[in-house]
Amino acid sequence: MSAANPETPNSTISREASTQSSSAAASQGWVLPEGKIVPNTVFVGGIDARMDETEIGSCFGRYGSVKEVKIITNRTGVSKGYGFVSFVNDVDVQKIVGSQIHFHGKKLKLGPAIRKQKLCARHVQPRPLVVNPPPPPQFQNVWRNPNTETYLQPQITPNPVTQHVQAYSAYPHSPGQVITGCQLLVYNYQEYPTYPDSAFQVTTGYQLPVYNYQPFPAYPRSPFQVTAGYQLPVYNYQAFPAYPNSPFQVATGYQFPVYNYQPFPAYPSSPFQVTAGYQLPVYNYQAFPAYPNSPFQVATGYQFPVYNYQAFPAYPNSPVQVTTGYQLPVYNYQAFPAYPNSPFQVATGYQFPVYNYQAFPAYPNSPVQVTTGYQLPVYNYQAFPAYPNSPFQVATGYQFPVYNYQAFPAYPNSPVQVTTGYQLPVYNYQAFPAYPNSAVQVTTGYQFHVYNYQMPPQCPVGEQRRNLWTEAYKWWYLVCLIQRRD
């Protein structure tokens, strides 16, 4: 029997390496599959989407010269969460497997690389029945190297802490699409629409973990669309409009749990629309305009409980409109312009109590307008344009102290415009086109206290002042000479 099966040194080394790696793997809770241990190669599990092959190779460079790093992906190119690291020289695989390696704040699962053995049927021993069946014939968990050698990953015992990032598409023919920008860690952001014929689309930006943001519209023919931005966990933000024929649309941004944000307009014929952004629980934000013929609309952003945000203008013919964003209780936000013919409008965003936000332009014929965003007390934000015929407008958003943002165009026909976003102190961002009839506009972002942002006329200083005194003296001297001759 000994002559039939001689034991070579290589087989002894292979058996010892297998025994050592098996003990190291057992210490980490693995059940190694049948096969031959590949020397100088380590299995690496727990790889997430943030890790690439270059970084992993640099991490394992402390143990020896890395020959190749291979991250296993599926047919769509998405990482399966594991891979293999092979070394050029002989390394102590048992030492590497027994070490604790943390990468990007996450502990990696290490083990020996196992090469699948091609066994004949007569040499296969009967094995006990396993609960989990082996992978299908397409070998989703197998890595093939250029030498046509096949490696199996060690079977890791279930761990409730372990997170899996595999993607499972419920409907292969689903029209859902995900367009991503800068990618952060994303888990299970595939969509599982209830109706495969739904025209649901999701456009994502910076991705944070997103769970179950699929829509389940009450009516499959509803033109419901959701445009998502920075995604936080979103639950049940489907729309169930009271009237299936309503043109209701919701565009969501940062998503928080949203409940009952469907609109129930008092008049089904009202052109009421709601555009939602950062969604918090929203209750009763339907519009009940005092006048059914009023063109009142409400566009909501960060939603807090909203009460009584209908507009009751002092003059029914006034073209006043109110656009609300982050909603807190709003009182007295109707506009009472000093001049009933003034085309004054106010569009509010984050709503806090607002006082005295009417515009009192220096020239009653000025078409000045003010649009406010995050509302805190605002004082003296009237515009005093240098030219009374200038169609100057100011639309403010996130406001920090703003100085000198009036426009003094040089060319009246210039279509120059200035659009600002998050406002920090802004100086001299006026446009100086050549014509004073310019349709210049300034749009700013969130509103904080704004003081004295009118542009006062500049007084002469320094050399300019001395030159003015010299000119004045010359004129005065001439006047005196003329009077003396008379």
UniProtKB/Swiss-Prot annotation:
**Keywords associated with the record:** Cytoplasm, Developmental protein, Differentiation, Nucleus, Repeat, RNA-binding, Spermatogenesis
Q: Which SMART domains match?
A: RRM
Cellular compartments per GO CC: cytoplasm; nucleus; protein-containing complex
Q: Where is the composition biased (Low complexity)?
A: 11-27
Which spans does this entry mark as compositional bias, Polar residues? Answer: 1-10
Q: Has keyword RNA-binding? A: yes
- Tissue expression summary: Testis specific.
Q: Where does the RRM domain start and stop, copy by copy? A: 40-115
CDD domains membership = RRM_DAZL
Q: InterPro entries from the xrefs?
A: DAZ_dom (IPR043628), DAZ_RRM_vert (IPR037551), Nucleotide-bd_a/b_plait_sf (IPR012677), RBD_domain_sf (IPR035979), RRM_dom (IPR000504)
Q: Where in the cell is it found?
A: Cytoplasm; Nucleus
The segment annotated Disordered runs over: 1-27
Q: Which disease is it linked to?
A: Spermatogenic failure Y-linked 2: A disorder resulting in the absence (azoospermia) or reduction (oligozoospermia) of sperm in the semen, leading to male infertility.
Self-association or partners: how does it assemble?
Forms a heterodimer with BOLL and DAZL. Interacts with PUM2, DAZAP1, DAZAP2, DZIP1 and DZIP3.
Quote the record's domain comment.
The DAZ domains are essential and mediate the interaction with DAZAP1 and DAZAP2.
Q: What does this protein do?
A: RNA-binding protein that plays an essential role in spermatogenesis. May act by binding to the 3'-UTR of mRNAs and regulating their translation.
Please give the family membership noted in the entry: Belongs to the RRM DAZ family.
Its recorded name reads Deleted in azoospermia protein 3
What is the scientific name of the source organism? Homo sapiens (Human)
Organism taxonomic ancestry? Eukaryota, Metazoa, Chordata, Craniata, Vertebrata
